């Protein structure tokens, strides 16, 4: 299964190994267990570690393998195939709803500016020659002007 060149040498704890190569028994009460490794022992351990240049990377990454498996699944029927072709021709787009409009920062700033202008107008700080404009989102996005409707109602009474 594993080639001998792919095996990694086991890491030997230098604290548990004696200088003559024999392993000593682990003693739980020993003060040597809590000591920090000395530089000489670290160098010896590091010399034993080697990188294997004969190890080859896999042909495909994991994500690529998953994509290949998904693409290789057969289409169950003709209607699904047609639906996928149509979906690929028209990518999904976000739907613009009232909530998404309210979250849009530019639209929010415009709305706040209009509200602020309206408040100034009510206080009398701005000139009065501007016609009434409703600040609700329906009137804004439908471009519906209630002042024109009020004029139409007045014309019908005459």
Curated annotation (Swiss-Prot):
One cellular component term from this protein's GO annotations in UniProt: nucleus
Pfam families in the record: PGC7_Stella
Record's protein name: Developmental pluripotency-associated protein 3
Region described as Disordered: spans on this chain: 1-38, 54-78
Bias kind Acidic residues: ranges: 26-35
Coiled coil: none
Source organism (scientific name): Rattus norvegicus
Highest taxon in the source lineage: Eukaryota
